[in-house]
Amino acid sequence: MALITAMLTVALIATLAATALWQQWRSLQVESAERQRQQALWLLSGALDWARLVLREDARSGNTDHLAKPWALPLQEARLSSFLASSSDGVSEEDLGVAERVFLSGQIRDLQARLNVFNLIQGDQASAVDVAAFDRLFELLGLPHEALEVLVRQLVAASRSGGRFVMPQRVSQLTWLGLSPAQLARLDPFITWLPMRTGVNLNTATPEVLHACVPGLRLADAQRAVLQRSAQPWRTLEEAAQQLGDAGKAVSGPGHQVASNSFEVIGRVRLGSTTVTERSVIQRDDNQRILWRERGVLAGPVRSLQ
């Protein structure tokens, strides 16, 4: 009996010790993960400041925005140490060692390369010109016209509600207004939500968006125009109109532009087993305003930003 009691006591002590060790290990793991997350957020804040600087300096260099501009070049995943090594500031060997384990990637997207859903209303009325543009996009993508009608009706109702109905702030929230997840996924590459009326930048728009925003422009002609544009971006609306043939007669501001002021910045930091992604929308003005910002923490491998 005494032997059994002793064995049970030893087993209990071993169990308690193992439990304590496990809890300590988990605590260290949580602490390490939180530390990595905070470090990643700090790096992403620096990356966002850098992106705002790039956009500000770019605005000073000309009156057009196109896909050959420096901001349009994605940053493929690279070690942080590759940036520190080229810095003129003194960087310690210890810092470089840590930076070897940190990977950065990111890109800046022109949101005015897309149709702005906010444009569907003007005041508290539907905008006929913009509804027609979205109708062409819906038809091109094989989406029902009825879905667009519901979307416009809901937007008009929200604009007339005196604040009783909340307007979306993200494209992902357009399901509030009647779009199904499948319809939204189909539209997502071609639309945006910006809290002001915006024109489409003809220099950065895809063939699908050009077809939608320029009445009478066939998709095949839009595709040819994009190929020509890649060799020589359009400096003025007049140049763009000439390249779009007969349909170019419909090109005019402010619905069409060759420059942009609204951009999305996507940054990603991979640090150990922690990956943090941040998306921000910047309004390029005197203050480089951040319209909104969201972050997500992922575990394990992630897909490329491209």
Identify the role of each PLM range.
Residues 1-306:
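Compositionally biased linear targeting/interaction segments
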